[in-house]
């Protein structure tokens, strides 16, 4: 009798061990199935955190504004400004006439229509017009393929860029890698930041950001003339970035 009881105890113990092993194995299987989801969620959270920090850093870039930019633009609110390489043109009749721009009512986006050319090369082309006297053309800013921003003309003066809107707009020329006219990611990001800061500075909304096409019907900037949805997304990105700059500035003041 005692042997039978002992046998039953051993059998019960084996069954309990098997059940525990079975539960452990099932739990491991569940965890293995969930692992990709957990990794994906962690990656998403990391990306969101990185994007938030990146937006905050962009909004705080004004701390590094150099003395040349200060001299070119004067005593203004630099908070949220991107890094700007100031290389002002010589005052001349063909690219920097030195005529006052009394009130900025809009931002005009252009493309260079010269694939692979650099911001520096386009700036130098404007500068050399004083000697070649080929035509009258220029821009306040030129953004390069790596996102570098070169300022050619103070925003207090007109540029020869946007025809009958020269007298009340700031112009931004953008370099591009190919004939499609689509900007690189770095060019795009700098364009959004610069435009958002200018909109904040001059109290403009996204509707005040226009294409050269909207002034003259010219195929400029080509990619945004041919892709209306991409243009509207760009203006939405500008509006969002402008709000980020304002929020960061208010947070800093509080």
Residue ranges, per PLM feature:
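N-terminal catalytic cores of peptidoglycan-degrading enzymes
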Residues: 3-162
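Basic/polar, cationic surfaces and motifs that engage anionic cell-wall
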Residues: 24, 28, 33-40, 48-82, ...
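Extracytoplasmic/periplasmic, Sec-exported soluble proteins
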Residues: 99-101, 133-134, 160-164, 179-190, ...
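Soluble periplasmic/extracytoplasmic beta-strand elements of cell-envelope proteins
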Residues: 108, 142, 171-173, 210
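Short strand-loop junctions, especially beta-strand C-caps/beta-turns
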Residues: 112, 175-177
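Short coil-to-beta-strand
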Residues: 163-171
């Amino acid at each position: 009798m005692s042997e039978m009881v002992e046998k039953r105890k051993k059998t019960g113990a084996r069954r309990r061990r098997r059940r525990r092993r079975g539960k452990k194995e099932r739990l491991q299987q569940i965890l293995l199935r969930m692992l990709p989801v957990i990794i994906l969620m962690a990656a998403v959270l990391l990306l969101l955190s990185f994007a938030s920090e990146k937006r905050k850093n962009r909004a705080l870039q004004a701390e590094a504004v150099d003395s040349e930019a200060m001299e070119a633009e004067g005593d203004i609110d630099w908070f949220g400004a991107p890094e700007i390489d100031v290389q002002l043109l010589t005052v001349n009749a063909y690219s920097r006439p030195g005529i006052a721009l009394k009130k900025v009512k809009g931002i005009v986006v252009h493309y260079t229509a010269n694939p692979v050319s650099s911001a520096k090369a386009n700036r130098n082309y404007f500068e050399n017009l004083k000697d070649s006297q080929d035509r009258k053309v220029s821009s306040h800013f030129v953004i390069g393929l790596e996102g570098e921003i070169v300022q050619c003309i103070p925003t207090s003066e007109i540029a020869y860029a946007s025809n009958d809107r020269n007298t009340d707009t700031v112009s931004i020329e953008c370099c591009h890698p190919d004939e499609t006219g689509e900007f690189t990611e770095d060019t795009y990001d700098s364009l959004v930041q610069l435009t958002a800061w200018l909109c904040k500075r001059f109290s403009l909304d996204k509707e005040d950001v226009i294409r050269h096409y909207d002034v003259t019907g010219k195929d400029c900037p080509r990619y945004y003339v041919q892709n209306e949805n991409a243009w509207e997304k760009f203006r939405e990105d500008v509006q969002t970035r402008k709000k980020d700059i304002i929020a960061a500035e208010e947070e800093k003041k509080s």
